[in-house]
């Protein structure tokens, strides 16, 4: 796989109220091209939108890829890179024996990751990272659309 096969993705989630109407956004860059994705849910949480952004971005790729995935959510990054193995081993329970929140999304995200080689990068939100700012704008657009504002 060459550098030109490398795909860079930024994802973000937003919520107006938590829970409340929310949106997700993703910016995908590859070989000089870009694709923007976004959507929303009228009743959700910020974490669910962060997770949905990753799932939708990865599922939009039509072949196994080498990806740098930029997220501003430590919940998403740590959940997939550190916590999920323990949750599965414990029957989807946390260390304090409580059910893992958003289990269906963790499972969908793990499945979406399987066919790709992913390097996870945490970026500070609202700190000038151009890709993150674009993903944030898309997530806000998704939120606005489910709230009936264009």
Swiss-Prot record:
Cofactor: Mg(2+)
Cofactor binding note of this UniProt entry: Binds 1 Mg(2+) ion per subunit. May bind a second metal ion at a regulatory site, or after substrate binding.
RNase H type-1 domain location: 3-144
GO MF term set: magnesium ion binding; nucleic acid binding; RNA-DNA hybrid ribonuclease activity
Gene3D superfamilies named among the record's database cross-references: Ribonuclease H-like superfamily/Ribonuclease H
Keywords (A to Z) from UniProt: Cytoplasm, Endonuclease, Hydrolase, Magnesium, Metal-binding, Nuclease
Enzyme Commission (EC) number: 3.1.26.4
HAMAP family to which the protein is assigned, alphabetical: RNase_H
Protein name as catalogued: Ribonuclease H
Organism taxonomic ancestry: Bacteria, Pseudomonadati, Pseudomonadota, Alphaproteobacteria, Hyphomonadales
The gene coding this protein: rnhA
């Amino acid at each position: 796989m060459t550098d030109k096969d490398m795909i860079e993705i930024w994802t973000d989630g937003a919520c107006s109220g938590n829970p409340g109407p929310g949106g997700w956004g993703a910016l995908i860059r590859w070989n000089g091209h870009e694709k923007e994705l976004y959507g929303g849910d009228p009743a959700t949480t910020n974490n669910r939108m962060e997770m949905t952004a990753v799932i939708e971005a990865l599922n939009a790729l039509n072949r196994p890829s080498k990806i740098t995935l930029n997220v501003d959510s430590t919940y998403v990054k740590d959940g997939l890179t550190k916590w999920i193995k323990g949750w599965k081993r414990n029957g989807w329970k946390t260390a304090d024996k409580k059910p893992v929140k958003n289990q269906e999304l963790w499972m969908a995200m793990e499945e979406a990751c399987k066919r790709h080689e992913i390097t996870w990068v945490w970026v500070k939100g609202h700190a000038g990272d151009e890709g993150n700012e674009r993903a944030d704008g898309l997530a806000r657009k998704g939120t606005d659309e489910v709230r009936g504002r264009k």
